[in-house]
Amino acid sequence: MGLIVYYSSATGNTEYFVSQLDQRLFKIDKKKPSMLVDEPYVLVVPTYADGEGKMAVPKAVIRFLNEDENRKLIRGVIGGGNRNFGRYYSLASKIIAEKCFVPCLYRFELRGTEEDIICVKKGLERFWKQLV
């Protein structure tokens, strides 16, 4: 079982989603985002974006990933979002995947569905086995 690092907003959608995954969790603290992880992880992140797609990645996540050790250990990203935002849906995960050269493993809407949870659990199990 791998480590899930996540950031959740006041809505709690991302936190709810990751709590259903039966994985070890590490929450990026908005007030202390420079905390370090010491093992490979998958990042789960919501999208914050204005109407033009700007500022999609939460600032705390940017600060967390600006730490070299944290950036070296990211192995994949899962994105949360809201389809009402069209092309900006789950934009943060796409940006992070591109900048960190890791795969975007999955995208879910709002709190995710039971089907999303099942897919992500199975996908993470396969993903972590491939990395070993």
From Swiss-Prot:
Q: Name one GO molecular function term.
A: FMN binding
Single Gene Ontology BP annotation: protein modification process
Family of this protein: Belongs to the NrdI family.
Q: Which PANTHER family match?
A: PROTEIN NRDI
Under HAMAP family, the record lists: NrdI
**What InterPro entries does UniProt report for this protein, alphabetically?**
Flavoprotein-like_sf, RNR_Ib_NrdI_bac, RNR_NrdI
Which species does this protein come from?
Bartonella henselae (strain ATCC 49882 / DSM 28221 / CCUG 30454 / Houston 1)
> SUPFAM superfamilies under this entry?
Flavoproteins
* Disulfides per UniProt: none
Protein name from the UniProt record? Protein NrdI
Q: What does this protein do?
A: Probably involved in ribonucleotide reductase function.
- Any Pfam family matching the protein: Flavodoxin_NdrI
